[in-house]
């Protein structure tokens, strides 16, 4: 679902409320980095000023299972394609704690919310951090 305008603004209010739900966990994980928690709060309130949100849902497969893997693969491809076109986006799922409210706002029934991707042209492109050595171990193909 592509969301903009008034519904996007209503979603931002839900996202800000979602932050308060996830904040205790973030404060534990980043106990020594409070600026990260405050940065996340700011992001939840604005979603980077993106003009549109992609709200991704999974339906059920013929077997009755949620198609979350297919939705995840589609979102990853969307993010790669967006980057290739100069757009910025980020996969967010902290807002899943507000799924019932998001579904009600968008009129979605019988689908599972997977993620929300804010999408737009970035103000800047961050530098790619250097890779840490020793994080990948090759076992074969020698």
Which positions does each model-derived feature cover?
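Small-aliphatic-rich amphipathic alpha-helix that forms the alpha element of a beta-alpha
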Residues: 54, 59-105
